[in-house]
Amino acid sequence: MFYQENFDVIVVGGGHAGTEAALAAARMGQKTLLLTHNIDTLGQMSCNPAIGGIGKGHLVKEVDALGGLMAKATDKGGIQFRTLNSSKGPAVRATRAQADRALYKAAVREVLENQPNLMLFQQAVDDLIVENDRVIGVVTEMGLKFRATSVVLTVGTFLGGKIHIGLENYSGGRAGDPPSIALASRLRELPFRVDRLKTGTPPRIDARTVDFSRLQAQHGDNPIPTFSFMGKTSDHPRQIPCYITYTNEKTHDVIRNNLDRSPMYSGVIEGIGPRYCPSIEDKVMRFADKNSHQIFIEPEGLTTHELYPNGISTSLPFDVQIQIVRSMDGFENAAIMRPGYAIEYDFFDPRDLKQTFETKFIDGLFFAGQINGTTGYEEAAAQGLLAGMNAALQSQGKEGWCPRRDQAYMGVLIDDLSTMGTKEPYRMFTSRAEYRLLLREDNADLRLTEIGREFGLVDDDRWARFNQKVENIEQERQRLKDIWINPNSDHVDEINKILKTPIAREANGEDLLRRPEITYKLLTQLEDFSPAHIDTQASEQVEIQVKYQGYIDRQKDEVEKSLRHETTKLPFDLEYSIVKGLSNEVIAKLTDAKPETIGMASRISGITPAAISLLLVYLKKHGMLKKGE
């Protein structure tokens, strides 16, 4: 039977991609349905209890700038906050938070249940309803059918999921949850390229059985950062430390002696695992020269004894896992509460996606999260928000949108995936972006919030706060420009005391702030430049904008030059074989990838500048170039 109401957008899956997708569509005024096999696991942290990090924190800030949930939920659930790379330049500084799993999940659930235009329903989805190459709804496991204009699949590791512990394996979406077998089979019938990936998780440890006096404590930052641009430190629960221990030669001997019982090394697992989060057996074999590996001991929450030993993800048998854990300092008597395991699952080649996350072969069907070959909560959330937003735009009959590579790490993410695809779980790093200085954590709102407001993603409170911040930055920069100091000024001696070289000519506040020895805080403590009446977010922007203005302007010039043909559209059905001068290799690669734009085509391996020139000549000859391109 069909459900009595129709929906604009249906989201399948309630993880980090699904929750952001559903909330985005609902915020944009679309009647949205979120289907999940278990409402109690909405927003669950399936792996490590942490959000953010290098590149990942940038994505979280961008999701937040567009009105998303992840940063706010982290502020409410975060039990330790740190700024990574704090001594380096602003482009690579990143926020990372340990989270209380229960508090984080509760924060997500509360927002979902109170979001207008959003309905939650507990049922697994077994089938899609497709007519004339367009999705029009879904079928649940009990046969109930739902109609919608757009469907977003955010199914994580559940598609054909298989869990491995030693040489034993069984079907599962994650520990304790069933897999999506019927839906996986249905998707394999559609014209998508599909493959298998693998990820893993470590055994969880009972903190009561650990000798913390043998471990190195790692405390969070003080003052405590916030993740959301709307956040405040009073949102945070009690803060607690993490700990550090190390593997040793005994650990490594245990692993080497049991490789014949490893599903990875015995050929049972065929899926490729994450390069930047390898299992402990992988680390021991790949880095045989290392005598030890650092292990971060992360509390799972304030009201549980469970610990997450970040760095010993493993699929070795349980008896071997016990030996590995007890070989480490402080863990000689440790008890395991949950065994570690590996999981294999289906993913779909993201080159079969448009940059809006809509599939190229089935209209109205969007993919987001691990189904696209990514790894990580943050990557999933970013994809989910954009997919949900574009599904909503489609249901409104409007053109889709995604940020460019110079606008957001989100843009880098979808461009990398849809242009180059991936053979291993894709993780975001700052090194993947060409314009890192423009894509900082601190300016994510300045880059994206206005765009989010135009699409209906940003509410009135955030919009008012954003406009006040922009006004504060502009006013403070103007104030500094208007204050002039010369060698004969009354307080020049006070200023010269903190300068490496005394003032030799007239200078204003911004001139002084550009000096490497001067910080905004130091400058505004001087009599001529105090007091400063702006908050930390605005003052941080003033300092970065002034100190790095030359470099920022240079990157903006580079962007302007590269954009000339970046967004020039290529017809989906273009016959590349009739474009004169293209080699057979180039024709094959372009035909396979079906790039949407000249910019995407230029980033495909083996596509030369000469080939791009030939494409532009062809487009111009056939009247496909807009004026000025």
Curated annotation (Swiss-Prot):
Q: Which Pfam families match?
A: GIDA, GIDA_C_1st, SAM_GIDA_C
Q: Name one GO biological process term.
A: tRNA wobble uridine modification
GO CC term, one of those recorded:
cytosol
Q: Which GO terms describe its molecular function?
A: flavin adenine dinucleotide binding
Q: Where in the cell is it found?
A: Cytoplasm
Q: Which SUPFAM superfamilies match?
A: FAD/NAD(P)-binding domain (SSF51905)
Hydrolase keyword on record: no
Q: Which domain of life is it from?
A: Bacteria
| Name of the protein | tRNA uridine 5-carboxymethylaminomethyl modification enzyme MnmG
Q: Which gene encodes it?
A: mnmG
